[in-house]
Every structure is written in C-alpha cells, then in structure tokens.
Amino acid sequence: MKCPYCSSAQGRCTTTSSGRSITECSSCGRVMEERQTQNHHLFHLRAQDTPLCLVTSDLQTAAQPSPEDEEDPFEPTGFITAFSTWSLEPSPIFARSSLSFSGHLAELERTLELASSTSNSNSSTVVVDNLRAYMQIIDVASILGLDCDISEHAFQLFRDCCSATCLRNRSVEALATACLVQAIREAQEPRTLQEISIAANVQQKEIGKYIKILGEALQLSQPINSNSISVHMPRFCTLLQLNKSAQELATHIGEVVINKCFCTRRNPISISAAAIYLACQLEDKRKTQAEICKITGLTEVTLRKVYKELLENWDDLLPSNYTPAVPPEKAFPTTTISTTRSTTPRAVDPPEPSFVEKDKPSAKPIETFDHTYQQPKGKEDKQPKFRQPWLFGTASVMNPAEMISEPAKPNAMDYEKQQLDKQQQQQLGDKETLPIYLRDHNPFPSNPSPSTGISTINWSFRPSVVPGSSSNLPVIHPPKLPPGYAEIRGSGSRNADNPHGDF
C-alpha cells in the first residue's frame, strides 16, 4: 500500500476515537485506508449419527402361523442387532469480515477534529465552515490535478484565517479558493487565476478580493517568482506540443522582456503567450493565434498588442548565437500581425472621376453634392466649391441656390438635354444684341399655310465677318433709321399692301 500524500509505503493499523479501524501512514500520519469490520453469526448444520441398541433372545420361539417374509429387515434371526439414528443439528460459528476503502472521509474527520481542538470556538458553525472549506479545496484541487500537500496547506491557511478574522457575511467558498491560490503560488505551480476561477466557479474579481483579505489577516507577502515566466512557460509549451528549441527560445525571450522591462504594463502570462508566438514564427512552427489564446486564456487582441510591443525591441530579444530557421525579415517584417500592409498607408489623392463614369447611372443616389456644396440663399456672391462646371453641361458656373434643389448628380439624359440647349443658344445668339424688330424673328419658321396670301420673308442673321477672312456668303445688315423716326416693330414679315410695316 502506498500513501497518496507522501508516497510512503509504510503504514500502521490503529483505531480512531470513534472505534473505526484505519491504516495511517508512518511518515506523515495521514489516513491511508479505512477498514470496516462486521461480525457475522452463522450456524453450521452437522450430521449426527446416534446408535440405538436392541437386544433379542437367541432362543427360538414357537413357530408362528404367520407367513414368512424374507425381505423384512426386522425379522428376528436369533442374533443381536444394533440400530442407529441420523440427524442434522445446527452448530454456531463466529465469523468476522473486513471491508477496506479510501481513507478520505477518515482523513476529513481527523482534520476537522484537529481544527475543532485548536480553534477558540467549538460551535457547530465553525465545524460547518471548516467542512465547506475543506470540500471546496478538495474539489478544486482534484479538478486542477494538484498534490495533496497543496490542498492541505490551503486548508491550514483557511483555519489560520478563521482564527485571525471573522467570517460573518463572507463567502466561505471564495475564501477557501483564495487560500488555494496562495498555496499554489507558494508551491510555484503553473496555474493561472482564470483556470482556478473556472474550476471553483468563483469570479476572478471575488477571488482577488479575498486574496487581499487573506493577506491582511495573515500578513502574507507575494511569493518570489510565483507568477514568473519560468513557471508558466513549460506548461504552455507542453500543451502546444512545441519542441525543445522553440521552448528554450520562448523562455529566453520572456525572461529578457521581464529583465529589461520592455512590457511593464503586461503580466507574465501575456508576455509568455507573445514570446511563444514570436518563437513559433522564428522556428517556423505552424501555431495560430487562436491555438495559443486557447491554451493561455488570452484574447487575440491582447496577444496582438503584446506581440507588437515585442517587435519594437526584437533585436534585443534573440540570443547572440541564435540562428533562426526563418529570417527575421520574412518572419515578421515591420508590419502588424493581422495584415501584411504597412500600418501607415501613403496619402494619395483620389483620382478624378472620368467623363464616362459621370454618365453612368448609379443605382444608389450619391448625396455628396447635397451636403458638400449646399449653401444658404442670400450668399450668392460666394464662389461655388466645385471646379468643373462643364461636367454639368452649363456654359457658366451654376448658382449655389439652384444646387440646393438638386437631389442628386445629373444623369446622362439631363446632360444631353443641356447640350442641346447650349447648341440652340449658340445658333440663335444673344437676343439682347439684336434690334427690336429682329428679336421676335423666328429663324426656324413653321410651314406656312398655302391658303393664305401672305408672303413670308426670312431674315437670316449672320455674325459679323472678321476682317481679313474670306467668305462667299452674302451678309445682310439691318437698315439704319435716321434720327427722329420711331422704331419699326414687326414680326419679321412684310406685306405688299404695307411695305413699311406700319400698323
């Protein structure tokens, strides 16, 4: 038999105060095994053969007239015959049986008795609190796979804390979990606070609160290197199935970061995770951020931030005689983890939209012009912001007041209509420069009715010829009126009865 606490193979049999038989360890004195003995009252049936003697005379008697029966065993033959009786009688037997099982309950009883004897109060409340704390510590320790020495030390811390402070209105389970965290740190076991919180079903904030209470009650100090890189790194590398070279490189990077204070705002677990990811990049190990975060309990955002901080000093992180499997320029070019592009993109002006893109109808209206170029009425003296009025098909810059009513950018049909109006205006010319009798002249007359006797004369207007230019087309100038005569008004047509156009 082997002791589950100290692994000793020597034990001795003894009896508890309640009369139970146990086997305790000779080295540590803890209960290894408990035996339960039971007496059994049995009866054994034994066969008993009792002789019965019957004596008969040897003399022959007178012959009887009864018929002879040769098969009769009781027929006297004249000799002495011995008879016996056979029977089954129960005989009592005193037997004892023994049942052996684990000694956890007996160890719990021994621990509670020891706690009750050392405590100042022997009330039932203290016993119940000790029982709850012991069960909490044992359950969490079994889930995390901790040694029995750690759980025993945690329960001792709980008893000392109960003696030093009051547990009224406080959670016994949270205090027991805090005692287990302190025992784990003193034993330098690689267990994170997040793992303990999940196993104990207690929030990390609550555990931290009771760790502070425990430290104030027992005047405890933080153990040296209880949460260092060397504690967590081997466990993380083992769970990630990394080889020895990657593990040594990650440990070296983490220790350099801690010693040179490159990441002062980060805890050792975050630094360990980032160092593992950096070592995997240099050793060409295919480990994703999600895999590392699942093992270490971090988020991918935190991992990327710490990794970015490590890259700022990556020249000082690597050993002097180390040759990476992947060159650092390829392993981590000066970029972020999530993208291969530079973090500060070059400032390039957006290209101007082409004329064809302006004509393309868009399925979704663009409201850029409404918000960008919208100006209140009464401020028409200000120059509009856009520089390309020809894209809208107008001869001059549009009035900002007109742009307020425009819901969206003009499409291709509006542009063609504006171009047609522009051509007509160029052909008609500016009417303000014409004489009054030619302003109402229509250069594109409709078809005259053949039934009317009115003859129509078309006055075609031509711009003045530039001197020096040769042209074969005749130029018709409007007649000049002498001073003092009223201006002749007409529709551009003359009648034979009224040659001067008088009304």
Curated annotation (Swiss-Prot):
The keyword Membrane applies. A zinc finger (TFIIB-type) spans 1-33. It is a peripheral membrane protein. Residues 355-366 have a biased composition (Basic and acidic residues). Residues 333-346 have a biased composition (Low complexity). InterPro entries: Cyclin-like_dom, Cyclin-like_sf, TFIIB, TFIIB_cyclin. One of its GO terms (cellular component) is nucleus. Widely expressed. Ubiquinated. Subsequent degradation by the proteasome pathway. Keywords: Chloroplast, Membrane, Metal-binding, Nucleus, Plastid, Plastid outer membrane, Transcription, Transcription regulation, Zinc, Zinc-finger. This is Plant-specific TFIIB-related protein 1.
